[in-house]
A protein has these predicted regions:
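Catalytic Zn2+-binding segment of zinc metalloproteases
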Residues: 150-166, 210-211
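Residue-level signature of catalytic and energy-coupling elements of molecular machines
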Residues: 68, 92, 129, 148, ...
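Short pre-active-site segment immediately N-terminal to the catalytic Zn-binding motif
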Residues: 130-144, 193
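Active-site His/Glu-centered metal-binding helix of metallohydrolases
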Residues: 146-154, 198, 202
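Short, Lys/Arg-rich cytosolic juxtamembrane segment immediately N-terminal
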Residues: 6-14, 156-161, 229
Length: 258
């Protein structure tokens, strides 16, 4: 089990290359076509092509700088009131202090299932919990679920998942979904294949109380089905249709043995 905690997410460079290629190749080809069809000096034609390449670099950087905002908008979250959700805020503060990371902002979705996720672009992070998690879980269960969120932030998984999913989301659904198989493979390449197990074990190391997370995951399983295809990998308990390597029953069995 120790090995699941040692391996982290892979390099994000292929994600940026994929996005730049998917956006830039059509732009560069269009620029070349314009340079060929419209009579112009060679230098001007080269400038058109260089301009297309520069636009590609700008669009790639702009997308990266806003991936956290893009995903929070996609999830349709609202700020969690610090009075109504004082318990969650207090738990996040304590768990963050224990793990050595800055406490994330807390957001809420109106979904009545039990689930949570972490969003992080580079610095500040965000924790998102469902209304179901806020209302259905007792303190120990919520602590276990939030501990997994903090563990993903501390271990780098939150940033890797945020950037990979946020950058490649345009190619997993909608008019560009013909690129979905390649985009999905790229996301899976970046994310640690043991991420669910390593997250569970890191969360338990934070709380020192495996039943809390176990019971939260059991309730999440009963409420499974949250989220869209594009955000499935972000959740602590991914929808059953996602490409999660480990079935939830395996995760629960390991927690029962812990």
């Amino acid at each position: 089990m120790d090995s699941t905690q040692e391996s982290g997410p892979g390099s994000l460079t292929p994600v940026f290359v994929f996005y730049a290629a998917a956006v830039g190749i059509p732009l560069v080809l269009l620029a070349v076509l314009i340079a060929v069809v419209i009579p112009m000096p060679l230098v001007l034609g080269l400038l058109v092509v260089v301009g297309a390449a520069a636009l590609t670099a700008y669009l790639t950087h702009r997308r990266y700088s806003k991936v956290d905002e893009i995903l929070l908008d996609e999830l349709d979250v609202v700020d969690a009131d610090d009075h109504d959700h004082a318990r969650a805020y207090n738990l996040l503060e304590a768990l963050s202090l224990r793990s050595g990371v800055e406490a994330p902002e807390l957001f809420l979705t109106d979904d009545e299932s039990v689930n949570a996720l972490a969003i992080q672009q580079s610095g500040d992070a965000a924790a998102v919990i469902t209304a179901g998690a806020a209302h259905k879980l007792d303190r120990l269960q919520l602590e276990g679920l939030l501990a997994e969120v903090i563990a993903r932030i501390a271990g780098g998984d939150a940033r890797a998942a945020t950037v990979a999913v946020g950058m490649l989301m345009p190619f997993t659904e909608g008019p560009l979904s013909f690129l979905a198989p390649a985009a999905d493979a790229m996301i899976d390449r970046v994310l640690n294949p043991e991420r669910e197990l390593s997250g569970d074990l890191a969360a338990v190391n934070l709380t020192r109380y495996p039943p809390g997370l176990r019971d939260a995951l059991e309730l999440a399983d009963a409420d499974s089905g949250i989220g869209t295809r594009s955000t499935a990998r972000l959740w602590v308990v991914p929808p059953s249709s996602s490409s999660s390597r480990y079935d939830l029953t395996v995760r629960l069995a390991i927690l029962n043995e812990y």
